[in-house]
Regions:
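Long, aromatic- and glycine/proline-rich binding clefts that accommodate carbohydrate-like moieties
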Residues: 357-417, 421
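Hinge/lid segment of periplasmic solute-binding proteins
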Residues: 117-172, 302-311
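Extracytoplasmic/periplasmic substrate-recognition and gating elements
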Residues: 52, 297-364, 400
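Glycine-centered hinge/linker elements that transmit conformational signals in sensory
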Residues: 201, 237-266, 310
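Extracytoplasmic/periplasmic solute-binding protein
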Residues: 158-166, 171, 195-241, 277-279
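Short, solvent-exposed loop/beta-turn-alpha elements that line the ligand-binding surface or hinge
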Residues: 133-147, 190, 208-209, 215, ...
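Paired acidic/hydrophobic, glycine-rich loop segments that form the ligand-binding mouth/hinge
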Residues: 111-114, 278-283, 289-290
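Conserved N-terminal structural module of periplasmic/extracytoplasmic solute-binding proteins
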Residues: 2-122, 314, 417, 426, ...
Length: 448
């Protein structure tokens, strides 16, 4: 009997020990779950995370920072009730690059991220973004033909599709109509040329002893001229370029002639705001922002203004750059399907895209949304000057994407330096082109 009792007690002690061990294990697991509640453990189950910055991508005042995203999340969670979509608030645009880099380095990159133009190349280069070719190609409910072609191209890097476009803005030529009317000059058509552009600038430019100076243009740089005359300068990425082609010579000659009209004065954007300049290239987002009553009072209030396509060079077209805010997917996400469906909702759902017209200053990337009658009403509101939607369509259709390759910002600085040196110097332009061609290509070799 004593032996039996002893065995029972031992069994109870073993069971007690197992229970204690089990409690310890469960406690440790509960701590881990609490610590990882918003991290990897939760994400593997049902949490889809979004990387987004606060404020406007277009650097204008906007009180609807998260409105479109919140509406998209609400619509998504209704359709997929098992998925919870979250994002971190309060990350300003100027801090977003650093914040995203820290997330990548810590292994906690959000499943879906909004991509700043300056970050696109580096994110694709390091493999942080997922190639979307397989997802977009196999999805029967998705077609790239719904987009403006240039907006779709904005999501590519080295020929591969790493992102979907979200909103865009083409560069347009802002026009001080008051100056043109005063000088009895008709507003140019959408297919206007460099000859017309220079002729108007020359006619309106004059100075007086009273200080009532008037200028032709500000902000028209080599990128504007190259694009307008068909120069695809960085078509090979960081590969060899040719700075000596005739179209570049024509572009430099135009810039030199425009500068000479100013008698050495550096015309600025402030001069345009004060009503003293006929033309200034700006993104369409500025047009939308300054159509609002509050900003119209603060800026451009002393004159009547409108916008046009960019003027065409002799060997080019009415071409300008298209700036596009894109969204991409983390290459390490374990929620590929869920992330893709959310990206499609932001990028290709007409209802969500329509909200860009309501709560942002860019344009929807879906062609049928931007070119709808409702879009024109939402863009113009009750203002007298109606926007020429055919002109806007032409501007987007004829737009080009900013080159994307590793080291682009440095390469662009080299061309900036070359153009400034040539325009400020007294040497023959074509001779200087040959010298700078060598310098630019030497630099490109250092980044390859």
């Amino acid at each position: 009997l004593r032996v039996i009792v002893s065995d029972i007690m031992k069994t109870k002690e073993v069971n007690r020990g197992l229970k204690v061990s089990l409690c310890i294990i469960l406690f440790i697991l509960s701590i881990l779950i609490m610590q990882l509640g918003d991290g990897s453990f939760r994400r593997t189950r049902s949490n889809l995370t979004i990387g987004v910055f606060s404020g406007s991508y277009w650097d204008v005042q906007n009180g609807n920072t998260y409105r479109i995203l919140d509406d998209a999340i609400e619509k998504y969670e209704k359709k997929y009730p098992g998925i919870h979509v979250t994002y971190e608030t309060g990350i300003v645009k100027s801090d977003y690059t650093e914040w995203l880099n820290e997330k990548i380095m810590s292994g906690s990159m959000p499943d879906v991220v909004f991509i700043l133009g300056i970050d696109f190349s580096s994110l694709a280069e390091i493999g942080a973004l997922k190639n979307l070719a397989a997802l977009s190609g196999s999805d029967k409910n998705f077609t790239k033909e719904d987009y403006f072609s240039s907006a779709w191209e904005s999501g590519k890097y080295a020929g591969k599709q790493y992102a979907l476009p979200f909103e865009c803005a083409p560069q347009l030529m802002f026009v001080n109509k008051t100056i043109l009317n005063r000088e009895k000059i008709a507003l140019p058509d959408a297919d206007w040329t460099w000859d017309e552009f220079y002729s108007i600038c020359k006619k309106v430019a004059h100075s007086s002893e009273e200080g009532n100076n008037q200028y032709g243009v500000t902000g028209y740089d080599w990128t504007c001229a190259f694009n307008a005359d068909g120069v695809d300068f960085f078509s090979n990425g960081s590969g060899k370029v040719d700075f000596t082609v005739p179209a570049i010579t024509d572009s430099l000659n135009l810039l030199e002639k425009l500068n000479e009209l100013n008698d050495g004065y550096q015309v600025s954007g402030a001069d345009f705001s004060d009503g003293n300049v006929a033309f200034q290239p700006m993104p369409f987002s500025q047009y939308r922002a300054y159509k609002s009553q509050e900003l119209r009072i603060k800026k451009y209030s002393g004159f009547e203004w409108s916008c046009l396509t960019m003027p065409a060079g002799p060997d080019g077209d009415n071409v300008s750059e298209l700036d596009t805010l894109c969204i991409g997917m983390s290459s390490s996400t374990n929620m590929e399907k869920e992330a893709w469906n959310f990206m499609k909702l932001l990028s290709a759902d007409p209802e969500i895209q329509r909200e860009i017209l309501l709560y942002s200053d860019g344009l929807p990337v879906m062609r049928n949304v931007t070119l709808s009658d409702e879009a024109q009403e939402l863009i113009e509101g009750d203002h007298e000057n109606s926007l020429n939607m055919e002109m806007l369509e032409q501007a987007i259709d004829h737009s080009v994407v900013t080159p994307r390759f590793r080291g682009y910002s440095g390469a662009k600085e080299q061309v900036d330096l070359a153009v400034r040196s040539i325009l400020d110097g007294v040497s023959n332009i074509e001779t200087e082109q040959i010298l700078w061609n060598r310098e630019i290509n030497n630099y490109l070799q250092t980044i390859n």
